[in-house]
Regions:
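Short helix-terminus and kink motifs of transmembrane alpha helices
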Residues: 197, 201, 205, 249, ...
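Internal catalytic domains of large membrane-associated glycosyltransferases
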Residues: 103-104, 111, 115-116, 122, ...
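C-terminal amphipathic alpha-helical interaction region
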Residues: 634, 642-830
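Composition- and surface-driven signal marking solvent-exposed, interaction-prone regions
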Residues: 181, 185, 250-252, 334, ...
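Short, glycine/acidic-rich beta->alpha junctions
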Residues: 184, 188-191, 251, 341, ...
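N-terminal membrane-anchoring/stem segments of glycan-assembly enzymes
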Residues: 2-26, 30, 34-228, 503-539, ...
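Acidic, Ser/Thr-rich low-complexity segments on the non-lumenal side of membrane proteins
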Residues: 222-263, 606-617, 715-756
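Basic/Trp-rich segment in TM-proximal cytosolic loops or flexible interdomain/linker regions
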Residues: 106-116, 120-122, 126-160, 173-182, ...
């Protein structure tokens, strides 16, 4: 018998005679494997063979097959590929990775266009169920209130900054008249204004949280359980790239199961949009998708799309989805790889969109949860306690011109496709090219086109995860810094609302503040040296008639330091008061709540100087043209090793020691003013290591510190995510299994694309690739060759058949496979 490779896999991977009535392998059913080795693929019958393989998978559960059990069925095994159905995978489910393509366009507009001219857009979108007017139906009843509120904010910040800056100038020896003092006062004014804006945002949020509502809150417009037309369909998409596969599909499963408990479940589809370029992860993703669909009976509801050409990273991934299937949906919910959303939250977002036809984006306020390291637990606590104040405050000032953070948000598809395509930034260097931080830009473009962007700060059921340690947080900040600096170029774009220009500026200040703070401290130290090492100057200005005596008022300096500290700490205290007013028991009780606030303040105070130096370096290196690789962050509790801490923080420790020694030699008393900064830099290495420890985080949790409601009373979605992630951890196939394991090879081939009439050049490349894989084994294959094999079902099937028909060739592959961590057999759903 000399079959085509796909037929070989269809028979051997899915043969029924090797299984007992419970679907388990029968170890006594081994037969001989046919001997011929072929590198040719018979083009005739490809479609029918692949169709038979699909039908077999539709009716069967994938099963792990040992070397002896890999076999071709004999004449007595049944007629053709008649595989008895397996529970959980009905015939109708199929293996459709994605729905049929319904092509549309999503062309980026010129950055100078205001998006109002329909003729300049050239895109048309949706089906009748998704079709909407080109312009939003929005009376902008909130716009006058938003403008007035922002004027009040500007007035408060400017007044407060003026008073503090005047006091700062009075503190300096020459009252801000020397060039060095002018620079110090200027930096202080910018930094104090930045702190003041955050302070007044928290004050506004505190007022809203205590009052319980805001008259302009978007959440107040939805009617609970309001009927939604069946024509209104929503896609939930999760773009991923080389992510932790168990965590991704655990969160997806929790979201799907929660959604299934709502009345709008049948109006949602879910998509995993993969940009993965790692062969091991790619195999694991396909199998995890299949297992998830089989367990949930979700074939045709949960889809998987792998993108071969990774253009424009995440924004390009979403744009690719919109071009293929955007016309099928009115709304689009975007999740991150660590996101979880409740079905009630998703249903509420759809109803909010239906109630507000002028809304283009509604952003939720995700609660951070799921981590156990000390660093992450402090961040989770801060996000859960202080976050509601700041998000409510952002809503208060921005209203319908709010932030969009790129995930855990709902988007109106048609205007998004019309107006939010992202063009490359012209020029050279790191501040040109593809947009990296796309979310702020998309929100600005949506608002520029007339659609409102809201923060639904009080809609519960939205969750995310924090970086597990300081180093991983800073790696993420490095990427965001470059993206925000690029976005600053767009702050002068034609047609933008002032609120979104301010958003671009605030994105830059989030990282430039570190550089400005460092410059302020360095100039202050230089001023100290000048005052000590240089004779006093009594005439510091041209045509000065009377001498200016240098003065030092330590009591004024203490007052200024106290005011600044109050602006930083008071919002945290107010947040704790607001939480206690609504019940502190989910946070460990009132005493532990305030103790946790104090502890988090100490941790943040120690980490702030470390972040300052890193952020300053990020800004400088980005402006100098030093790029950074965008990699997926860890999705588990990764701890920092001592060697990694030395590499990352060694220079900071040296800077802290040298700086402290220099200040002490100049004026020992002045060292106390810089001790909170320099002391943190000196202990950066042990601080980074210890804050990453899971054991310390869990001890604090056991003591009732840094406790959040998602831990004391975990929602069902979080419980499901944790349970499924733990259950699947360590049980994933990789590239080797994707070539050797018949069940997984069958799955990959069944979900792959076969060209019906391959050209001779393709046949030759395929034969060369298979021959190289046979000769070199998996370890010597390049990452690109591995991905090419997985993308070509025919080549994969040829390689698989040759390995199983030639034991001496299979040794290089099975040896690797045997050394891997064993995982449970793939079993039919019970």
């Amino acid at each position: 018998m000399n079959e085509s490779p796909l037929a070989f896999i269809a028979h051997s991977a899915l043969a029924p005679s090797g299984y007992d009535v419970q679907g388990r392998l029968n170890s006594h059913s081994a037969k001989a494997v046919p001997a011929p080795i072929t590198l040719a693929f018979e083009s005739s019958g490809n479609r029918s063979t692949r169709g038979a393989l699909r039908r077999s998978f539709r009716q069967s559960g994938t099963k792990r097959v040992t070397d002896e059990q890999h076999r071709v069925p004999g004449p007595g095994d049944g007629d053709g590929l008649g595989i008895p159905p397996v529970a959980g995978v009905p015939w109708q489910a199929g293996l459709a990775l994605a729905p049929p393509i319904n092509r549309a366009t999503m062309a980026p507009l010129p950055w100078t266009s205001n998006g109002a001219s329909e003729s300049a857009i050239g895109t048309s979108s949706a089906n009748p169920g998704a079709s909407e007017a080109a312009r939003p139906v929005d009376q902008n009843y909130w716009q006058a209130a938003g403008q007035f509120r922002r004027l009040v904010l500007v007035g408060l910040v400017l007044t407060q900054t003026y008073l503090a800056t005047s006091l700062m100038a009075a503190v300096l020896p020459y009252h801000g008249r020397e060039p060095l003092e002018i620079a110090i006062v200027t930096l202080f004014a910018i930094l104090f204004g930045w702190v003041s804006a955050g302070f007044w945002t928290a004050i506004a949020g505190f007022a809203i949280v205590l009052a319980g509502h805001d008259r302009y809150a978007i959440s107040a417009t939805a009617v609970p359980d309001a009927p939604v037309s069946p024509a209104v369909r929503t896609a939930v998409v999760m773009p991923i790239c080389n992510e932790d596969v168990p965590r991704v599909f655990a969160g997806l499963r929790a979201t799907y199961e929660s959604l299934a408990r709502t009345d709008l479940a049948m109006q949602f589809d879910m998509f995993v949009l993969s940009d993965t370029n790692n062969a091991d992860s790619r195999v694991a993703e396909v199998e995890a998708w299949f297992e998830t669909c089989r367990a949930l009976d979700a074939f045709g509801r949960i889809f998987y799309r792998w993108r071969q050409h990774r253009i424009k990273r995440k924004s390009g991934n979403i744009a690719d989805f919109c071009r293929r299937w955007g016309r099928n949906y009115r709304y689009l919910v975007i999740l991150d790889a660590d996101s979880v959303m409740s079905g009630e939250c998703l249903s509420t977002l759809v109803r909010l969109m239906e109630a507000n036809p002028g809304a283009g984006i509604i952003q939720t306020a995700p609660n951070a949860t799921g981590r156990d390291t000390l660093h992450a637990r402090a961040q989770q606590f801060a996000s859960r306690v202080y976050g509601p104040l700041f998000t409510a405050g952002l809503h208060f000032w921005q209203l319908g011109e709010s932030h969009y953070w790129g995930h855990n948000a709902i988007i109106r598809v048609e205007p998004f496709m019309r107006h939010c395509g992202l063009r490359r930034l012209t020029g050279r260097g790191l501040l040109s090219g593809e947009i990296l931080s796309h979310d702020f830009v998309e929100a600005a473009l949506m608002r520029r086109a007339g659609w409102s962007v809201w923060i639904a700060y009080d809609v519960p059921g939205s969750y995310e995860e924090m970086p597990p340690n300081l180093i991983d947080e800073l790696k993420r900040d490095r990427r965001w810094c470059q993206g925000n600096l690029m976005n600053f170029r767009l702050s002068v774009m034609n047609g933008l609302q002032a609120a979104h220009r301010a958003v671009f500026v605030s994105g830059v200040m989030a990282y430039a503040a570190g550089l400005l703070w460092l410059a302020f401290l360095v100039l202050s130290t230089i001023l100290l040296a000048v005052q000590i090492l240089r004779d006093p100057q009594y005439f510091v200005a041209a045509y000065q008639m009377f001498p200016l005596w240098p003065e030092w008022h330590p009591e004024w300096a203490l007052t200024l330091a106290g005011v600044t500290a109050g602006l930083l700490f008071l919002p945290k205290l107010l947040a704790a008061i607001a939480v206690a007013a609504h019940g502190a028991k989910p946070y460990g009780g009132g005493a532990r709540l305030f103790a946790s606030v104090l502890g988090e303040s100490v941790v943040s105070m120690l980490l702030a100087p470390i972040r300052m130096l890193f952020h300053a370096r990020f800004v400088v290196t980005t402006l100098c043209g030093w790029g950074v690789a965008w990699r997926s962050p860890p999705r588990n509790d990764a701890e920092t090793t001592w060697s990694e801490a030395w590499r990352q923080h060694g220079t900071q420790t040296l800077i802290g020691l040298v700086w402290a020694a220099a200040v002490y030699s100049l004026n020992p008393g002045f060292l106390w003013w810089l001790l909170p900064v320099l002391g943190a830099l000196i202990v950066a290495i042990p601080l980074s290591v210890l804050s990453s420890r899971v054991s310390l985080g869990r001890k604090l949790r056991d003591a009732g510190l840094f406790v959040i409601p998602e831990e004391s009373h975990p929602p069902r979605e979080i419980q499901t995510t944790m349970e499924e992630s733990r259950r699947a951890d360590g049980a994933l196939p990789g590239f080797v299994e994707g070539v050797v394991d018949p069940a997984i090879v069958g799955l990959l081939c069944a979900t792959g694309h076969v060209r019906p009439r391959p050209k001779p050049a393709l046949r030759a490349r395929r034969a060369t690739l298979v021959r190289a894989a046979l000769q070199r084994g998996p370890d010597d294959l390049s990452p690109a060759d591995r991905m090419r094999l997985l993308c070509d079902p025919v080549a994969l099937a040829q390689l698989h058949q040759n390995l199983w028909t030639a034991p001496h060739l299979r040794f290089a592959w099975t040896g690797v496979r045997a050394s891997r961590t064993a995982r449970p057999a793939l079993r039919p759903a019970q």
